[in-house]
Amino acid sequence: MQIRVTATAAIAKKVHKNTGFQRFINNSLDRHFSGDWGDISEEDAAANTSDPLYALSAYTAPDGVKIWIKQDYDVVTVLFPSEY
């Protein structure tokens, strides 16, 4: 299976303006793919672990900006929580 990673326009805009944010996104994707679901409840983490192809993870950047990573089988989307 080939995973396709996408980002919303707002995420792409912030990445384009801020290389530090780009590094944060890359690190967050690495964490997501390794099963580190970030800042979510234990219940949600257990659901992700039981079915990682349909997972939602959440991470907070050093500047306080929060992102979500939503996986639906072979499509992974990086977005801001307000975009869900």
List PLM regions with ranges:
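Short, compact, well-ordered microdomains
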Residues: 51-84
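Compact soluble domain cores
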Residues: 1-57
